[in-house]
């Protein structure tokens, strides 16, 4: 049943407009607008509030059994055409049995294949969506060809072909949802046709039919799927958790050369109020800095500190997400628990979690980011004096969470012994870090509280110094190892404001040749830069690269 709308308003193209060709079995609602050379196939439903204007770009084709829902806009540019399934050129081609849902925008040149589903408020512009694709809500598809049978999640922004090629395949539950929506609109079409037929509508009006409301909840979308094409599901879960906890979100980028020195540069500030806005801002940062490292961080605006740092893109591509991140059930508190994630990063508030300190987790993260291998060794008190260490089970893990689990297993197996963490350069086949993480009297205290006075001449240490030091025994061990390995030491500092941008300032290399002199210089730096972040740097003078970065003082 074809219904003609009111006359089109005058435009520069009005004089040469062709008449729309509408199949007699199609239903076009009186409150819709169809202008120009539009071919509408059999059993099509055009709902109220739609605007199909083939005046500037022309012609349009809408295949049989397609339903176009309320508020859909189909328009085309004067230039640009797509090739339809009949090998003719069209400004817009919509195939058979397709579904364009509420408020969708199809702007030509555009192609939507057979049995495709375009979700609410999604936009297709200068693009081709293959047959059998499902596009969920609020998505943008522009300047790409989406292969057939692909799933575009809600909020996705697909603007380059690499993104389109990486899209996941449609799953059965996605088809079920699309068929559910299409079924409702086919029922509407039958209802509209019945309403126009007095013989059909009269008996229904005379019947007293009790209405009911279904309590069944339809699964609208795959909750575990990627809700953004460029970002993993795990990153999205982290963003959602941070926003729910009232934290701010930021992002930083750095090229491969500066990554070694930790010279991160902030991306554009993210003022997002919703997950969708935050994801869009992150994707913009990824697009602007492809081929670089990009990391996401969360900020506690009250404590003015970071609660999360995780790398979401590496130069060889986006970090593959996993489902290992689990948002805590309650707000983060003072215990500063560490949460591992599939990107090989974690976040901590400076205390301990389980059997591994937050400082050890930071060291693990730095070693993995530098491409180093990680190992562990243990020794009892008697053999500690002779340095007869034994290796624990080899660690083949590539993420911080897996390494932490392996460390905890080693700690459980060798309670009452010394255990140390080893960083190994697989290319040079040498050690870049040796750090004791457990002593017979318990776990090594983290160095996140630089004000604590710790004696370096502890009975459990194999080497004694003449004076007490503000540094923790772990930092003293690191200084000893760096000097013993022939490396240089340096100090960097930064205030709280510049810490967010990673703008560290160096005090220059420490020229000390003995452990005592180096500790004295480090303590002088801590006093000079009280109230700032201070980190210790180990430098390989031959390879001219850093072998250690560890924060030894916080504000």
UniProtKB/Swiss-Prot annotation:
Binds 3 zinc per trimer. Keywords: Bacterial microcompartment, Carbon dioxide fixation, Carboxysome, Cytoplasm, Disulfide bond, Lyase, Metal-binding, Photosynthesis, Repeat, Zinc. The first amino acid of the short form (equivalent to Val-226) is not seen in Edman degradation, while Ser-230 may be post-translationally modified. Migrates in gels as 2 about equal forms of about 60 and 35 kDa (called M58 and M35). They are probably the result of alternative translation initiation. Pfam families: Hexapep, RuBisCO_small. InterPro entries: CA_gamma_LbH, CcmM, Gamma-CA, Hexapep, RuBisCO_ssu_dom, RuBisCO_ssu_sf, Trimer_LpxA-like_sf. One of its GO terms (biological process) is carbon fixation. Residues 330-351, 445-464 have a biased composition (Low complexity). It catalyses: hydrogencarbonate + H(+) = CO2 + H2O. Residues 347-440 are annotated as: RbcS-like repeat 2, SSUL2. Residues 223-315 are annotated as: RbcS-like repeat 1, SSUL1. It is found in: Carboxysome; Cytoplasm. Signal peptide: none annotated. Carbonic anhydrase (CA) activity is probably under redox control to remain inactive in the cytoplasm. Carbonic anhydrase (CA) activity of full-length protein and N-terminal fragment is inhibited by ethoxyzolamide. N-terminal fragment CA activity is activated under oxidizing conditions and inhibited under reducing conditions. Optimum temperature is 25-35 degrees Celsius for N-terminal 209 residue fragment. The active site is at 56 (proton donor/acceptor). The keyword Ribonucleoprotein does not apply. Zn(2+) binds at residues 75, 102, 107. Belongs to the gamma-class carbonic anhydrase family. Functions as a scaffold protein for the assembly of beta-carboxysomes, initiates carboxysome assembly by coalescing RuBisCO (ribulose bisphosphate carboxylase, rbcL-rbcS). Produced as a full-length (M58) and a short form (M35), possibly by alternative translation initiation; probably both forms are required for correct carboxysome assembly and growth. In this strain both forms are equally abundant. A moderately active carbonic anhydrase that catalyzes the reversible hydration of carbon dioxide. Essential to photosynthetic carbon dioxide fixation, supplies CO(2) to ribulose bisphosphate carboxylase (RuBisCO) in the carboxysome. Also hydrolyzes COS. The N-terminus (residues 1-209) has carbonic anhydrase (CA) activity. The C-terminus has 3 repeats that are similar to the small subunit of RuBisCO (rbcS), called SSUL. The SSUL are connected by flexible linkers. The N-terminal domain probably forms a scaffold on which CcmN and maybe other carboxysomal proteins assemble, while the C-terminus binds and coalesces RuBisCO. This is Carboxysome assembly protein CcmM. It comes from Nostoc sp. (strain PCC 7120 / SAG 25.82 / UTEX 2576).
């Amino acid at each position: 049943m074809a219904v003609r709308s009111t006359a089109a308003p005058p435009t520069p193209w009005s004089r040469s407009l062709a008449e729309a060709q509408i199949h007699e079995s199609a239903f076009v609602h009186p409150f819709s607008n169809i202008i120009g050379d539009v071919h509408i196939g059999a059993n099509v439903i055009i709902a109220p509030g739609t605007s199909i204007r083939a005046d500037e770009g022309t012609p349009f084709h809408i295949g049989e059994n397609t339903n176009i829902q309320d508020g859909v806009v189909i328009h085309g540019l004067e230039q640009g055409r797509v090739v339809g399934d009949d090998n003719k050129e069209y400004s817009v081609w919509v195939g058979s049995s397709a579904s364009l849902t509420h408020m969708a925008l199809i702007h030509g040149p555009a192609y939507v294949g057979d049995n495709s589903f375009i979700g609410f408020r999604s936009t297709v512009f200068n693009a081709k969506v293959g047959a059998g694709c499902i596009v969920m809500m609020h998505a943008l598809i522009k300047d790409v060809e989406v292969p057939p049978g692909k799933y575009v999640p809600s909020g996705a922004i697909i603007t380059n072909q690499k993104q389109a090629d990486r899209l996941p395949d449609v799953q059965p539950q996605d088809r079920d949802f699309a068929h559910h929506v299409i079924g409702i609109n086919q029922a509407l079409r039958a209802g509209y046709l019945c309403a126009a037929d007095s013989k059909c509508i009269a008996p229904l009006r005379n019947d007293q039919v009790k209405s009911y409301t279904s309590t069944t909840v339809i699964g609208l979308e795959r909750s575990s799927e990627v809700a953004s094409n460029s970002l993993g599901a795990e990153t999205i879960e982290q963003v959602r958790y941070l926003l729910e906890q009232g934290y701010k979100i930021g992002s930083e980028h750095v090229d491969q050369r500066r990554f070694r020195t930790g010279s991160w540069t902030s991306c554009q500030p993210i003022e997002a109020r919703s997950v969708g806005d935050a994801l869009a801002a992150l994707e913009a940062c990824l697009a602007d800095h492809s081929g670089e490292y990009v990391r996401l961080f969360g900020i506690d605006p009250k404590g003015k500190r970071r609660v999360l740092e995780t790398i979401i893109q590496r130069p060889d591509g986006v970090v593959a997400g996993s489902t290992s991140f689990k948002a805590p059930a309650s707000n983060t508190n003072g215990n500063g628990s560490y949460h591992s994630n599939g990107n090989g990063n974690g976040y901590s508030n400076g205390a301990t979690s389980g059997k591994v300190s937050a400082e050890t987790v930071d060291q693990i993260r730095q070693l993995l980011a530098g491409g180093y291998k990680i190992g562990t060794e243990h020794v009892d008190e008697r053999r500690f004096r002779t340095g007869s260490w034994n290796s624990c089970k080899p660690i083949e893990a590539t993420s911080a969470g897996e390494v932490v689990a392996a460390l905890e297993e080693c700690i459980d197996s060798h309670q009452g012994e010394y255990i140390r963490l080893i960083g190994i350069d697989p290319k040079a086949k040498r050690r870049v870090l040796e750090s004791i993480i457990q002593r017979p009297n318990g776990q090594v205290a983290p160095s996140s509280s630089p004000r604590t006075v710790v004696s370096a001449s502890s009975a459990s240490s194999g080497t004694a110094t003449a004076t007490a030091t503000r540094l923790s025994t772990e930092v003293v061990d690191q200084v000893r190892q760096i000097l013993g390995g022939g490396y240089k030491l340096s100090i960097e500092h930064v205030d709280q404001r510049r810490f967010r941008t990673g703008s560290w300032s160096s005090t220059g290399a420490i020229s000390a040749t003995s452990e005592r002199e180096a500790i004295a210089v480090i303590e002088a730096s801590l006093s000079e830069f009280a109230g700032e972040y201070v980190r210790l740097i180990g430098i390989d003078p031959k390879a001219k690269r850093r072998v250690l970065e560890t924060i030894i003082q916080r504000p």
